[in-house]
Amino acid sequence: LELANGLRIFPGMETDVAEGGHILSIGPLEAILELNRRLEPHKEKETFPPLADLLDLLEQYPVLVGCAHPFRAPGRVPEQPMEQLRRFHFLDLNGKDMPQDRARTQRLTQALGKQLAIPVVAGSDTHQAVQYGCISTVFARGCATVSELWGEMQAGRYTIEVADQAPFQV
């Protein structure tokens, strides 16, 4: 879906894991809807899936998998075994964290991305309309499909832009 202002919207969801933290998946609408249905029994804190189990499930679908705001407390995803972390396609540099401690958030997230050799892209963590656009990933080329999006991420053909008003948006 592409909006009049050029914003592309790809289906996705965020899933809580037992270790603490949030895992993102982006892919075809049918895959996201089916994953959401299959994860229905695991949406309460005491039933969150372990990271390894969730990644096993996600690997059965044509989705990109990322770690949302990896260094936000109380998340513990970066402390998980390296063999699990290497299963991520990308990390999220999250807009909600930027106004609080931008230097730390960027330093830690970029360092983990480099260690894992995966892209770090922006996520606005938009739960309310005012938060939209506090941080953006701007791609050099248009992406109409998830595979095109992944190709541009892998090629590094994007910039991350933080809005001047971000501290007031989140």
Model-inferred region functions:
Residues 3-8, 17-33, 73-170:
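Charged catalytic cores and adjacent phosphate/nucleic-acid-binding surfaces used
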